[in-house]
A protein has these predicted regions:
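Short active-site neighborhood of thiol/selenol oxidoreductases, capturing the structured segment around
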Residues: 29-57
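Thiol/disulfide oxidoreductase modules built on the thioredoxin-like
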Residues: 108-164
Length: 196
């Protein structure tokens, strides 16, 4: 059975990044091991995509019941000028007390977005202080070994995302030789994701 989300396991994405979290601890791919992780790019002033995504992830965790802690939500701010670590932490914790907010500087953000081939762009408003951000809509889903497996598009039904998370949780934490779902991947394969 295929996943409902786009299978991107064979694409070389999200392997070489580092970004401080809202507590100042630098995080990287190795920190995504042990749980299924849903990582997405957004900003706290986002009027629609980001709060909707956080609400849907809360619904997935509710469906998971006692296993809810096996899904780690990671929010990467694309608006470091306004999203201070404290602002970002307060934002994500309003939806999920265990969510992690990553907030770096412009250079760190550009490098991380490049590693994920994630689009973001500042859109000027009528006056310099008012602007919004366009950004990729959807999330990157990692398995318990910290390997990027899926891209879940924005608007993916909660029950289907829940199903994909459950499938990843049912995989062995350390696959036996010959049973690794990524064994058939070619390291030379690479591709880009569509922007919102």
């Amino acid at each position: 059975m295929d996943f409902y989300a786009k299978d991107i396991a064979c694409e070389e994405l999200g392997q070489h990044w580092s970004m401080p979290d809202s507590q100042g601890t630098v995080r990287g791919p190795a920190d995504l091991q042990g749980q299924v992780t849903y990582l997405f790019f957004g900003f706290t002033s986002c009027p629609d995509v980001c709060p909707t995504t956080m609400i849907e992830l809360s619904q997935v965790k509710h469906l998971m019941g006692k296993d809810a802690d096996q899904l780690q939500v990671v929010f990467v701010s694309v608006d470091p000028a306004r999203d201070t670590p404290e602002v970002a932490r307060t934002y994500v914790e309003a939806f999920d007390p265990k969510a992690i907010a990553l907030v770096g500087n412009e250079v760190q953000l550009a490098a991380m977005a490049s590693d994920f081939k994630a689009f973001y762009e500042k859109e000027p408003g009528p006056i310099p202080q008012t602007y919004t951000m366009s950004h990729i809509a959807g999330g990157y889903v990692f398995d318990r070994q910290g390997r990027l497996r899926l891209f879940a598009p924005y608007g993916m039904p909660v029950d289907k995302l829940f199903s994909d998370v459950q499938r990843l949780l049912l995989e062995p934490a350390h696959p036996a030789a010959g049973s690794d779902p990524l064994a058939s991947c070619s390291l030379s394969h690479n591709g880009a994701l569509a922007a919102r």
